[in-house]
């Protein structure tokens, strides 16, 4: 019997409807709406596309959205001054700096200059520390891990006491989702193991997982025999493995493959995310959730 599909596209729509409704209610109550600014340096095509999607989503849910495009020649000093301007703008609740930045600019210095209370990506060291402490200290969880946890909860997967194995140790996904799943609270209370591509007998670790979260960036890494029967499998990998011609547009598009052998795994797992259409749509969705939270914190509503 095939596994239940956990579709990020469906969950995204549920959450964005909830955010849109709450924004409308807050506007009626306070006369204000959340503000989100995305700073784009240069014209990297992938970055332009991603920023456009963020701005469109912010507009859809009723935010004030600003796309601040800057020349690739902007100095580090001027970019820091721009961030400082938005840090001190009460109408802005979320500040995003789209990466990658030009080589003459220090990414870490720029990202660390963002006010932690407006760091809706959740990557400022202050927010990383808050996440580690857990509980009421947490303001913004990083968007992809937050999306993963939300998918697990909304799919009705039991996490309390569950064996969770996270394959991958990045600061963006692996480490934060492991930390989130081990905390006290809904969607957590799990027993968590972090493994990676250098782990000895990786398959044996995966085989005992009730919830297997794979974020290694290796296409097809996890084989069906690595999966416990009935497990929940969250495939975070989005690996470009070739191109094909789209039947809809006739244009060349990327062929994407996850870190899990999906076709075989879905016959063993109890639930599984597809690639594409699984975890991917959740990242921008949770960015909207974090921006709404920031607005509520700023206005004494949380």
From Swiss-Prot:
SUPFAM superfamilies recorded for this chain?
Answer: Aminoacid dehydrogenase-like, N-terminal domain, NAD(P)-binding Rossmann-fold domains
**This enzyme's EC code(s):** 1.5.1.5, 3.5.4.9
Pathway the protein acts in: One-carbon metabolism; tetrahydrofolate interconversion
Q: Which residues bind NADP(+)?
A: 168-170, 197, 238
The molecular function terms of the Gene Ontology recorded here are: methenyltetrahydrofolate cyclohydrolase activity; methylenetetrahydrofolate dehydrogenase (NADP+) activity
Carries keyword Secreted? no
Q: Which UniProt keywords apply?
A: Amino-acid biosynthesis, Histidine biosynthesis, Hydrolase, Methionine biosynthesis, Multifunctional enzyme, NADP, One-carbon metabolism, Oxidoreductase, Purine biosynthesis
Q: Which residues cross the membrane?
A: none
Instruction: Cite a single GO BP annotation.
Output: methionine biosynthetic process
The source's domain of life comes to Bacteria
Gene Ontology CC terms, in alphabetical order: cytosol
The reaction(s) catalysed by this protein are: (6R)-5,10-methylene-5,6,7,8-tetrahydrofolate + NADP(+) = (6R)-5,10-methenyltetrahydrofolate + NADPH; (6R)-5,10-methenyltetrahydrofolate + H2O = (6R)-10-formyltetrahydrofolate + H(+)
Q: What Pfam families has UniProt attached to this entry?
A: THF_DHG_CYH (PF00763), THF_DHG_CYH_C (PF02882)
PROSITE patterns with a match to the protein in the record = THF_DHG_CYH_1 (PS00766), THF_DHG_CYH_2 (PS00767)
Q: Can you state the subunit structure given in the record?
A: Homodimer.
Biological role: Catalyzes the oxidation of 5,10-methylenetetrahydrofolate to 5,10-methenyltetrahydrofolate and then the hydrolysis of 5,10-methenyltetrahydrofolate to 10-formyltetrahydrofolate.
Q: Which family does it belong to?
A: Belongs to the tetrahydrofolate dehydrogenase/cyclohydrolase family.
**What protein name does the entry list?**
Bifunctional protein FolD
Q: Which organism is it from?
A: Desulfatibacillum aliphaticivorans
């Amino acid at each position: 019997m095939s596994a239940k599909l956990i579709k990020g596209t469906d969950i995204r729509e549920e959450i964005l409807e909830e955010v849109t409704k709450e924004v409308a209610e807050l506007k009626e109550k306070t006369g204000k709406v959340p503000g989100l600014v995305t700073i784009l340096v240069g014209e990297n095509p992938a970055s332009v596309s991603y920023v456009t999607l963020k701005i469109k989503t912010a507009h859809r849910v009723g935010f004030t959205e600003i796309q601040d495009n800057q020349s690739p020649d902007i100095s580090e000093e001027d970019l820091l001054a721009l961030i400082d301007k938005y840090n001190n703008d009460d109408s802005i609740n979320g500040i995003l700096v789209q990466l990658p930045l030009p080589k003459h600019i220090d990414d870490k210095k720029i990202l660390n200059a963002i006010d932690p209370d407006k760091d809706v990506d959740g990557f400022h060291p202050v927010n990383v520390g808050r996440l580690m402490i857990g509980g009421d200290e947490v303001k913004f969880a990083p968007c992809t891990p937050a999306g993963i946890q939300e998918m697990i909860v909304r799919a009705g997967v039991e996490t309390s006491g569950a064996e969770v194995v996270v394959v991958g140790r990045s600061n963006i996904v692996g480490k934060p989702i492991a930390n989130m799943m081990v905390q006290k609270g809904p969607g957590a209370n799990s027993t968590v193991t972090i493994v990676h591509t250098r782990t000895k007998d990786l398959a044996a670790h995966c085989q005992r997982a009730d919830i297997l979260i794979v974020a290694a960036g290796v296409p097809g890494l996890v084989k069906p025999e690595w999966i416990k029967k009935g497990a929940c499998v969250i495939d975070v990998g989005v690996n470009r493995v070739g191109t094909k011609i789209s039947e809809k547009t006739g244009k060349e598009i990327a062929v994407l493959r996850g870190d899990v052998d999906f076709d075989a795994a879905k016959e063993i797992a109890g639930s599984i995310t597809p690639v594409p259409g699984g975890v991917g749509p959740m990242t921008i969705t949770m960015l909207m959730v974090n921006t709404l939270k920031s607005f509520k914190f700023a206005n004494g509503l949380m």
